[in-house]
Amino acid sequence: MPLVYQQNINPVTKLGVWHIGEPENFFLQQVPLERSITHPNKRLQHLAGRYLLQELYPQFPYSLIRIAATRKPFLENELYHFSISHCGAYAAAIVSTGNRVGVDVELMTTKVIKVKHKFLSQKEHAMIHSLTLNNSIELYHQLLTTTWSIKESLYKWYGDNEVDFIEHLHIEQINLKENQGIADCLFLKDAAIELQVHFLWFNNNCVSWVVS
């Protein structure tokens, strides 16, 4: 299926979301397959994510992708900075020739409530409650998933395993308007870095991205 969302974030950075409805053979015509991936669904997600890179930048060099010890894919020459995410039937990718980037896509689910203590501070949880005051429990679950996705995109932007989602990744404010918004964040690993994470809700999913 075609792209369900695409945005030229700035002159050198592009974001895309792909609904995976094709068989493996569709992607294998262009994308090399990692032989270590044996699960059919994970293999399809892997192929779709890499296919999307070249949809955004046709000259993107698939063959030069390397995997860091942190499992983050990268290009040694850093000609392109990129991030890939997939969840269920969707793959998301962001590619830039000049900015550091991170992206995450998540399915909205009530399961996130069971693990909220692993990624949300008390202050952040109180902020979510204030945003859902007089609104439905559905919005509460949507915002929980969104905060998880926001922090995942920050984690991918940084690209190092040694990140504590509560200690190092702080969401200071969320500005929500209908099905999209912006989160003002602080990254506190090595030095205090202010970052904005944009997010979009679509088809019961959330995609979040950060560019710096």
Functional labels for PLM-detected ranges:
Residues M1-S212:
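Core catalytic alpha/beta fold that binds nucleotide/phospho-ligands
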